[in-house]
Amino acid sequence: MSKDSAFAVQYSLRALGQKVRADGVVGSETRAALDALPENQKKAIVELQALLPKAQSVGNNRVRFTTAEVDSAVARISQKIGVPASYYQFLIPIENFVVAGGFETTVSGSFRGLGQFNRQTWDRLRRLGRNLPAFEEGSAQLNASLYAIGFLYLENKRAYEASFKGRVFTHEIAYLYHNQGAPAAEQYLTSGRLVYPKQSEAAVAAVAAARNQHVKESWA
């Protein structure tokens, strides 16, 4: 338990009349006071402690999702809309901050959420009839972000297969389209010139692999 979480537990205990030191260390005194509470109060304090890291992240313009939360939502949503779960597992670590036990993503600025969408792309998906919340709200939500990633995957798959008939839409190529947008992605696949070159090392490696796969298949 972090020091901030320990303080939250201890001050909650004191507010409930328990005599504990607020020192940011959960020792035998704090645990005994917690055990002495009725179950409903104990549960409320435990839930507060668990939610504190996420609340702190939001205050810092980031939100944190645990690996278990992401994996559970991906399994459900990928099956529902027909997008490979493995694609989500490929994309999310590239687009977000990998932290102990999960992922942190930005919820302010031009690019937001697990898919790092900008407003233009998000709103285009909504105009295409995809059932998504407004950009500010949806990009901070786990489920909405995952649906948006999947919906964009399906749109980009259609675009790729229309332009390059018979080619395999790999995860790397799907990520290239997600990262660059369909017109810029097609230009990169044919010319090798990246329209938006300012990317993380992981993103650059993924889009380079996409072009290598595309070119290799054209020689087959």
UniProtKB/Swiss-Prot annotation:
Pfam families: Peptidase_U40. One of its GO terms (cellular component) is virion component. It comes from the Viruses. Keywords: Cytolysis, Degradation of host cell envelope components during virus entry, Degradation of host peptidoglycans during virus entry, Host cell lysis by virus, Hydrolase, Viral release from host cell, Virion, Virus entry into host cell. One of its GO terms (biological process) is symbiont entry into host. Optimum pH is 8.5. Its main location: virion. GO terms for molecular function: hydrolase activity. It is found in: Virion. Inactivated at temperatures above 20 degrees Celsius. The keyword Cytoplasm does not apply. InterPro entries: Gp5_sf (IPR038288), Peptidase_U40 (IPR019505). Muralytic enzyme exposed to host peptidoglycan layer after membrane fusion during viral entry. Functions as an exolysin that cleaves the peptide bridge formed by meso-diaminopimelic acid and D-alanine. Also lyses the host cell late in infection to release the virions. Monomer. Belongs to the peptidase U40 family. This is Peptidoglycan hydrolase gp5. It comes from Pseudomonas phage phi6 (Bacteriophage phi-6).
